[in-house]
């Protein structure tokens, strides 16, 4: 009898969060109960049409993207191995990417369009770029005033590429001091109007601008109509997963197959817990700011996991690292003081057991490590890719152009 009661409670819980999801979490229309009923009774969309979403957290420092970069290198290697092509790139398997802070830099690099319409950079290229910026202690070697132009490092990587010049839709958040509200750089908006088309280098500089008393960044659209004064997205959207899902579920033109969260395949990658931050970074960042940023990121993770309900173990993967002890000396390190130590720490986090968000129960350790979850997600990406090749309509019309065999000249960002 108890088992039957538990099943009934589970069904009720799932129905409650389905209503919450449809009404509040991901921004569906605010109709009454009739609309909720129609959403629940709609015929299921084929699993071959799942929209694949990449979401990457990030802070203002290059170190904040190293865990994600290491995970993405592992993920890209896995899909290359399973696809049987060294030319395969992550942008060939994802339909949309969202990145905040250093995660926004990773998303922009992996999805920037190069020769033949192929992705310009590999995950290895992106990791190498972050490591070089770690060695140089930041995105720019020069200190700015109250307002400064985007870091020269981004100009070298992206040149004059804009949001329109990506192989798939890309979302990069920041916080606009002028309007005191979050601002989302979006290819969908850029495609509709030049007033929302920004250069990728400006978007990356904006999302990486320090929010703890550092210099803000001025950015303007390519036609000069829209201007913002930005600080890093950690203020409002350090974890952009919910923003990415909202974008997909409310953008039927690009994602006609996305009827609900069961039609999504999402991987969200964190930055590593701030308990593992280097002492130098902890000294610069107020404790309350770190707590607020981590709390907001965890809240998004918990809310997304709840919204996925019974699909949260199959359709939603969250990769997050905890503080890792140093090999020599006391304390913990996440990002570390050197690029070499940073790589070791990121790899160590991937070997940790994964942490899952559970409805009403907080967190629990999963049976798999972060690395094993990355590998399992790679299998799902390949399965989805295979279904689409079997004459299944694509989940997104974001166009990648060019086959996997199109050669792209190697360049160092």
Curated annotation (Swiss-Prot):
Judged by the first EC level, this protein's enzyme class is hydrolase
Q: Which GO terms describe its biological process?
A: defense response; lipid catabolic process
| InterPro entries tied to this protein | Acyl_Trfase/lysoPLipase (IPR016035), PNPLA_dom (IPR002641)
Per the Swiss-Prot or TrEMBL annotation, the motif GGXR is positioned at: 58-61
Write out the GO MF terms.
hydrolase activity
Q: Which domain of life is it from?
A: Eukaryota
Residue ranges occupied by any PNPLA domain in the UniProt entry: 54-245
The record's function comment reads: Possesses non-specific lipolytic acyl hydrolase (LAH) activity. Hydrolyzes phospholipids as well as galactolipids. May play a role in disease resistance.
Q: What is this protein called?
A: Patatin-like protein 3
| The organism of origin for this protein | Oryza sativa subsp. indica (Rice)
Gene behind this protein: PLP3
């Amino acid at each position: 009898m108890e088992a039957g009661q538990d099943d009934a409670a589970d069904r009720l819980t799932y129905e409650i969060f389905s209503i919450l999801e449809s009404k509040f979490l991901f921004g569906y229309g605010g109709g009454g109960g009739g609309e909720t009923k129609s959403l629940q009774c709609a015929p299921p969309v084929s699993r071959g049409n799942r929209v694949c979403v990449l979401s990457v957290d990030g802070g203002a420092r290059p170190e904040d993207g190293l865990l994600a970069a290491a995970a993405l290198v592992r993920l890209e290697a896995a899909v290359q191995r399973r696809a049987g092509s060294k030319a395969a790139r992550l942008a060939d398997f994802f339909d949309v990417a969202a990145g905040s802070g250093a995660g926004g830099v990773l998303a922009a690099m992996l999805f920037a369009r190069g020769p033949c319409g192929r992705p310009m950079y590999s995950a290895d290229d992106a990791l190498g770029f972050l490591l070089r910026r770690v060695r140089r202690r930041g995105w720019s070697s020069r200190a700015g005033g109250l307002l400064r132009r985007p870091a020269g490092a981004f100009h070298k990587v992206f040149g004059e590429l804009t949001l329109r010049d990506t192989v798939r839709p890309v979302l990069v958040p920041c916080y606009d001091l002028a309007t005191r509200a979050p601002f989302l750089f979006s290819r969908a908006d850029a495609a509709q109007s030049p007033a929302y088309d920004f250069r990728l280098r400006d978007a990356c500089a904006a999302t990486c601008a320090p929010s703890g008393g550092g210099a803000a960044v001025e950015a303007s659209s390519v036609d000069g109509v829209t201007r913002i004064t930005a600080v890093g997205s950690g203020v409002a959207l350090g974890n952009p997963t919910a923003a990415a899902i909202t974008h997909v579920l409310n953008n039927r033109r690009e994602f006609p197959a996305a009827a609900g969260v069961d039609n999504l395949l999402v991987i969200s990658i964190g930055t590593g817990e701030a308990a593992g931050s280097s002492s130098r970074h902890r000294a610069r960042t107020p404790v309350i700011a770190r707590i607020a940023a981590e709390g907001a990121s965890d809240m998004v993770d918990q809310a997304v996991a709840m919204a996925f309900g019974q699909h949260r173990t199959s359709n939603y993967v969250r990769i997050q690292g905890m503080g890792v002890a140093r090999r020599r000396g006391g304390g913990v390190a996440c990002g570390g003081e050197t690029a070499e130590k940073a790589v070791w720490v990121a790899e160590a986090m991937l070997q940790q057991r994964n942490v899952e968000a559970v409805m009403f129960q907080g967190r629990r350790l999963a049976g798999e490590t972060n690395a094993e979850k990355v590998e399992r997600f790679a299998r799902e990406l390949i399965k989805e890719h295979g279904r689409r090749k079997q004459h299944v309509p694509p989940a997104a019309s974001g166009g990648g152009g060019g086959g996997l065999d199109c050669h792209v000249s190697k360049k160092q960002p």
